[in-house]
Curated annotation (Swiss-Prot):
Cross-referenced CDD domains: ALDH_C
Family of the protein in this entry: Belongs to the acetaldehyde dehydrogenase family.
Listed GO MF terms: acetaldehyde dehydrogenase (acetylating) activity; NAD binding
Gene label: lapF
Name of the protein in question: Acetaldehyde dehydrogenase 1
UniProt enzyme class: oxidoreductase
Residue numbers annotated as active site: 130
Any single GO BP term: catabolic process
Residues given in the record as NAD(+) binding sites: 11-14, 161-169, 272
Reactions performed catalytically: acetaldehyde + NAD(+) + CoA = acetyl-CoA + NADH + H(+)
HAMAP family in the cross-refs: Ac_ald_DH_ac
UniProt KW keywords: Aromatic hydrocarbons catabolism, NAD, Oxidoreductase
Lineage, broadest ranks: Bacteria, Pseudomonadati, Pseudomonadota, Betaproteobacteria, Rhodocyclales
EC number(s) reported in the record: 1.2.1.10
Cross-referenced InterPro entries: Acetaldehyde_dehydrogenase, Acetylaldehyde_DH_C, NAD(P)-bd_dom_sf, Semialdehyde_DH_NAD-bd
Amino acid sequence: MKKIKCALIGSGNIGTDLIYKIKRSPVLEPVWMVGIDPASEGLARARELGLKTTADGVDGLLPHVLEDGIQIAFDATSAYVHAENSRKLNELGVMMIDLTPAAIGPLCVPPVNLRQHADRVEMNVNMISCAGQATIPIVNAVSRVQGVEYAEIVASLASKSVGPGTRANLDEFTYTTSSAIEKVGGAKKGKALAIINPAEPPLIMRNTIYCLTESAPDQARITESILQMIGEVQKYVPGYRLVNGPSYDGNKVSVFMEVAGLGDYLPKYAGNLDIMTAAATRTAEMFAEEILAGKIKLKTAEVA
């Protein structure tokens, strides 16, 4: 079966984990890995896995985009450089999946709103953050049953799984995730908190989600909605698991989740990597399926 060729930008934890996810895909093929440090482990790993590599940043990739037929790029660098990366690749007709908190494109959580982005042929979609991918489906599961006045999420991440790029973007991580809890999750007000836990051995990613409903919660319908949504996320992140809840206290709905990874690049505790890379891969797959079926055609920036 024909596959859509992909480039990965950023050779850190997220970019390297992405190689494994995309390699398993029936419709995506990783062809290029872009970094800035010739000695980075991610670039070495990419070469071992048969990818072409450059340590000259996106500019090192641009001359090869057309000859190698690259149609989708994943940006796992930093919010500070994403806009420029996206502009350069969009001009060549490459669709960008943004795994930084730059959020210059629409925010995407696959089980909530992926279909509408594919239908609109967006040339840049933003994957928010690992915490956003782990918690916004739950907030949305509550808000689709009844109004949510306030939603707060707390993500606890193993320090070893949080690389320099994510650390440099922690403020953007907070703003983008808080905003997405409102825009995608459907809460009137959203708040996101991240805790980087240095414990050894590293602890699995844990997420706490609190929702305050506008009226007394319809417990049966909310519980059913949450369990259905968890099933949707588990289709692409099998390690996504309900630990406790939903529990109800007045108008407060509390849900406790954990996310185990597949152990592709980092061990299984790094579920935060997996939920991000799996969501990005799922997003790319939907676009790829539509391209292969001839339903959509990516547009170059000049036409857009």
